[in-house]
Amino acid sequence: MIVIKDAHFLTSSSQLFQCPASLTSEMVVLGRSNVGKSSFINTLLGKNLAKSSATPGKTRLANFFSTTWEDKENALRATFNVIDLPGFGYAKVSKSLKKEWEGFLWELLSVRVSIKLFIHLVDARHLDLEIDKNAKENIQALLRPDQAYLSLFTKFDKLNKNEQHRLFLNAPKPFLINTAHFNALSSKYPTLEIVRQTLLKHLLTNPL
């Protein structure tokens, strides 16, 4: 069983020089505004670290968290950073600010060698949004051989059982979800433990 032994906030940045040194492997969490990034990060880490804004799209900072994972069964202990990116698809900002902000984010994702895993959160109720398709294409265009891209579906518990099953059959594998009610789901769906194992496996495949 994987246990998160430590998770704490490092810093926020809006420019590259403000980012912490690239000393350990990192996973990036991205998704459109109001997709549930804060909820996913807090569930994953077992701690209320990520804060959501009352106004979707208002936050324009990349937030860095340091985490230590322990897998006792395999005598493994490893430290990774989690980077929480601002939600994309916001509307209430000026064009100049939007351009500046997007420039920082894409530069961060392009040049930071410590990023090993991109986790793209997608609302399970809205699978075919153009904004998510564009984000996926842009991230995959950036991918280096030592990086991986995974989709993870949020708000899975908002679907009825037929919708859950249909998504499970048709979605790319590994099938990963986030919900506040993992224990209430059918046993065929991934648990929080499986989500953690999958992410850890990808982070360890190409260590920094």
Swiss-Prot record:
GO biological process, one term: division septum assembly
GO molecular function, one term: GTP binding
Keywords from the UniProt entry: Cell cycle, Cell division, GTP-binding, Magnesium, Metal-binding, Nucleotide-binding, Septation
Residues that coordinate or bind GTP: 31-38, 57-61, 84-87, 154-157, 182-184
Record SUPFAM superfamilies: P-loop containing nucleoside triphosphate hydrolases (SSF52540)
Record-linked InterPro entries: G_ENGB_dom (IPR030393), GTP-bd (IPR006073), GTP-bd_ribosome_bio_YsxC (IPR019987), P-loop_NTPase (IPR027417)
A Pfam entry, by short name: MMR_HSR1
Entry GO terms, CC: cytosol
Signal sequence extent: none
Named cofactor requirement(s): Mg(2+)
Residue sites binding Mg(2+) per the record: 38, 59
Domain EngB-type G, residue spans: 23-205
Function: Necessary for normal cell division and for the maintenance of normal septation.
UniProt-listed PANTHER family: ENGB-TYPE G DOMAIN-CONTAINING PROTEIN (PTHR11649:SF13), MSS1/TRME-RELATED GTP-BINDING PROTEIN (PTHR11649)
Assigned protein family: Belongs to the TRAFAC class TrmE-Era-EngA-EngB-Septin-like GTPase superfamily. EngB GTPase family.
Protein name in UniProt: Probable GTP-binding protein EngB
Species per Swiss-Prot/TrEMBL record: Helicobacter pylori (strain ATCC 700392 / 26695)
